[in-house]
């Protein structure tokens, strides 16, 4: 690729990323677009057809308050007729899994392969492939601190488990130190081009060939890297750096934790990164695809959670991982994934969630001027007839859990956050474990900056490095 073409590609990509980040985040202002909107070159805005009467305002039905009054959450701890906490957890978890609909079939074996690796500052970065379920062989990033058991020998990796709670115990072979581990769960951000790369810095251009899924399918392909592959690898790298600079203050959470002695794993959620559409990224297609999955008797959001449970089982099977010291963490949708995973997997011993906790009452309302309300990424059919978000998160009790929300986060109104935190503390307090639930409201927007990452590390260290 000549220099002119490369620079053009880089400029176009940078412009598109800047525009995407600007308009997708809650604090973005639309005022700066006024000049371009009045330009004579701008196309005329299409007229919106409207009738005199209506039944929806924005994305919410006009009778939403009536519907919410009917949500009594009968399976919440304290509302349920089950008064034994262990029995309640079992019944409530079963209800959540029932509403998540049919899970993907478990893979017969993980069949892990190391596609490429590079040495970083005190740890090794690997791009791997494994079977997360019977349908999907995916790529993921794995960071291993120096001195750990090698993951190169696939014979040391046990078979996939069909036990969704993590009750079965694995013990990897090999010699070397075992480390605590973290399953890092990426955000949504209305940005689907990258997923795991938001958590762990991707490899550079020279690793593109060996680290591509296509190379797994083309065993006889050339080792040379095409201009197209170089361009994609460079775009992924620059896109990830730009995203992390904006939402994570320029620090990759996964690399940060690996430097401090954790095995770190991160994969793409369905529809993100290397699990997206053949035709390319189109945010508007997400809801259509979620609808198609429901037509197939499956739920896209639930598939994300099922895969998070499965990948945690995979992480526990690795020989360099201490299976009794595994935590999870994430920001935004990653925070939602983190407390869902903590609630449903016994493998997880500690969880951290930054900028995702609310009540349905505060989420689906016009009271706080939210621009978006709900969405398929956290939609599990019928579950609100039984449990609200804080009730589900309370299934993690008495595990240590960290929740941080921001007072400047327009996606999660503080009254709803405080109400959710109050409900969770009631549950932990009822089990004499309130000191293990850390809920904090910081003076931050929707983000996970350096201070929040330091708090996550401190919390993980407190419970995984005793």
Tell where the protein language model's regions lie, with residue ranges.
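N-terminal pre-domain segments of enzymes
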Residues: 36-98, 102
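N-terminal cap/lid segment of alpha/beta-hydrolase-fold proteins
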Residues: 102-149
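Proline/glycine-enriched tight loop/beta-turn segments at coil->beta junctions
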Residues: 135-138, 146-150, 172-182, 188-191
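Cap/lid segment of the alpha/beta-hydrolase catalytic domain
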Residues: 177-178, 184-306, 316-317, 362-365
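Mobile cap/lid helix-loop segments that gate and shape the active-site cleft of serine hydrolases
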Residues: 288-295, 310, 350-393, 413-421, ...
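Alpha/beta-hydrolase fold nucleophile elbow
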Residues: 320-332
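C-terminal catalytic histidine-bearing segment of alpha/beta-hydrolase fold enzymes
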Residues: 376, 422-466
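Short beta-strand/loop motif that positions the catalytic acidic residue
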Residues: 403-405
């Amino acid at each position: 690729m000549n220099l002119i073409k490369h620079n053009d590609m880089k400029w176009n990509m940078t412009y598109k990323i800047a525009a995407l980040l600007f308009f997708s985040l809650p604090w973005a202002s639309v005022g700066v677009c006024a000049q371009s909107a009045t330009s004579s070159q701008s196309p005329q805005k299409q007229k919106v057809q409207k009738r005199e009467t209506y039944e929806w305002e924005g994305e919410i039905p006009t009778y939403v308050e009536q519907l919410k009054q009917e949500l009594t959450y009968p399976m919440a701890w304290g509302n349920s007729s089950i008064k034994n906490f262990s029995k309640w957890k079992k019944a409530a978890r079963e209800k959540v899994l029932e509403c998540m609909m049919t899970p993907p079939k478990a893979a017969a074996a993980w069949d892990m392969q190391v596609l490429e690796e590079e040495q970083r500052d005190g740890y090794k970065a690997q791009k791997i492939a494994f079977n997360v379920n019977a349908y999907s062989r995916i790529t993921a990033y794995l960071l291993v601190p120096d001195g750990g058991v090698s993951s190169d020998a696939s014979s040391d990796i046990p078979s996939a488990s069909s036990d969704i709670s993590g009750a079965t115990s694995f013990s990897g072979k090999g010699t070397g130190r075992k480390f605590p581990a973290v399953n890092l769960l990426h955000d949504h951000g209305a940005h689907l081009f990258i997923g795991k790369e938001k958590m762990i810095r991707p490899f550079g251009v020279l690793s593109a060939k060996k680290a591509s899924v296509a190379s797994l399918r083309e065993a006889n392909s050339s080792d040379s890297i095409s201009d197209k592959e170089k361009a994609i690898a460079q775009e992924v790298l620059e896109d990830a750096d730009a995203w992390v600079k904006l939402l994570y203050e320029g620090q990759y959470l996964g690399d940060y934790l690996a430097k401090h002695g954790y095995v770190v794993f991160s994969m793409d959620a369905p529809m993100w990164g290397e699990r997206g559409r053949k035709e390319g990224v189109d945010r508007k297609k997400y809801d259509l695809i979620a609808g198609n999955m429901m037509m197939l008797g499956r739920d896209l959001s639930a598939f994300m959670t099922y895969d998070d449970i499965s990948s945690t089982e995979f992480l526990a099977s690795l020989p360099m991982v201490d299976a009794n010291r595994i935590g999870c963490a994430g920001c935004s949708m990653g925070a939602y994934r983190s407390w869902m995973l903590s609630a449903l997997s016994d493998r997880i011993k500690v969880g951290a969630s930054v900028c995702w906790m609310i009540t349905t009452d505060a989420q689906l309302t016009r009271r706080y001027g939210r621009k978006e309300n709900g969405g398929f990424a956290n939609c599990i059919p019928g579950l609100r007839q039984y449990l609200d978000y804080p009730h589900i998160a309370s299934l993690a009790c008495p595990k240590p859990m960290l929740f941080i929300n921001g007072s400047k986060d327009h996606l999660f109104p503080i009254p709803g956050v405080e109400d959710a935190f109050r409900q969770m503390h009631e549950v932990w307090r009822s089990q004499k474990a309130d000191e293990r639930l850390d809920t904090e409201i910081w003076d931050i927007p929707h983000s996970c900056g350096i201070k929040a990452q330091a708090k996550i590390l401190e919390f993980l260290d407190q419970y995984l490095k005793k």
